[in-house]
Amino acid sequence: LNEVEMSPRCYQAELLAACEARGVRVVGYSPYGTCWLAKYFPDFVPWPAASVLDDATVAAVAAEAGCTPAQACVAWAMAKGASPIPKSLDPERVRATARCLDDVALTADQVARLDALRDPRRGVEASLAAHARIIASPDYAWDPT
């Protein structure tokens, strides 16, 4: 398993392809985007809307598919071959998300439209974390070298 941040706005297409080629299952966290940042650090969220759920394209795809924006994001991740792990504290939202496992299927065009939302910026970046004083120094951020 490889657990990575994965929403229509933030996903690593090359990593998904590499995992698929090697038979590694991708588990995608934050399928709705990292909207918690906007609540505490609105000036440092790199996207125009804090949550993918607020994006007009996501809303349009959801309306076409007869589902909620959250369900569209989960269905998108599943269409990409990932196992999304959305979070919600609301029991009804959890049930609604579970219903989409069988009830929501996106067309190839809808998946492509959500793919087009991809932005190279991550939801949580070392510079943001350091500036917002979540961590003391960018030296604590993971460095793959």
Each language-model region and where it sits:
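Beta/alpha (TIM)-barrel catalytic core signal, keyed to glycine-rich beta->alpha loops juxtaposed to Asp/Glu
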Residues: 1-145
